[in-house]
Amino acid sequence: MNHDSRTYPFKFSIITAVYNVASYLSGAVESILCQDIGFKESVELILVDDGSTDSSGEICDHYQALYPYNIKVLHKPNGGAASARNAGIALASGKYLNFLDGDDKLSPNTLSAVYNFFSTVDDQISLVSVPIQFFEKKENAHRLNYKYRDGKDQIIDLNVQYSYVQMSIASSFIKHNVLNDHSFDTSLRYAEDAKVIMQLLLDHPYYGIVPSGCYYYRFRNTQNSALNGTKLHREWYLDCLKNYLQWALHSARQKYGKIPFFVQYNVMYDLQSRFGVPEIPESVLTTAEHLEFRTLLKELLQSIDDKIILEQKNLSREQKDYIISFK
């Protein structure tokens, strides 16, 4: 990988897209202030207020007044998480970037653990991830945390460990100089973060894992676990499939002449939840759109080997058989 010889004033820039999270934002910020790597010496926090209508913007300004050297605040009209993150990247001056959500937290040792690992393998990878732990309404570990079960910092070779999916940008730490060549797709309401990560991994199918760090993902008490809000939006069924999953398969085929297993596994992991929706309301998809959705599913599945479907870790044998027959 290209060596980055530039000097950065901060080890990390934490970029947070802020939208109506007044009840939680202080917790997110405080989790950065208390990082044992040393906030004042090592960390820049960029708070992008994306047109909040509650007091989130004022909370951003409050913290900037307390730490004017370390905290930058940008107030902008609402444009979505992708546009807010892109705006934050333009302001960043840290060597490594992270995209903490405004209602989540990092464990106090996360930045030091990630930095220490990067310092030993900096020329080999551009991305490091940490485990995700849910809190508030749910308190279990993320289903992809099996990647960290060995408990060791290590480099993942996706050519071999193709089931070690990484989709969350919030639990990722990425080299600034590498991310400069990419941006978040503002046409996507969902999976804009996964698309950026896929771009990076298509270029270089290796990344690091640091099991001792932790990203705390707030599963809010107001969320309905039976029918997640994403399943009530047209974009999750159509735009995400066309502008992320189809794009991923096409890009992989163009680059490699085939679709590597790690791309197939990633796409199938993302697709599987679409088969768990009992009935899509007409208020979400029209009859024509529902037909388009089913056609897209079939087209995507044509590019996925049965082997990859059968190796999914969160589907029953009956579900796997159904998906294979659906092809």
Predicted regions: what is each one?
Residues 256-260, 267-327:
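Terminal low-complexity segments of carbohydrate-biosynthetic enzymes
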Residues 1-247:
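Nucleotide-sugar donor-binding/catalytic module of glycosyltransferases
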Residues 216-221, 227-256, 280, 285-306:
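Catalytic core of nucleotide-sugar-dependent glycosyltransferases
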Residues 119, 205, 249, 253, ...:
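Hydrophobic/aromatic-lined pockets within catalytic cores
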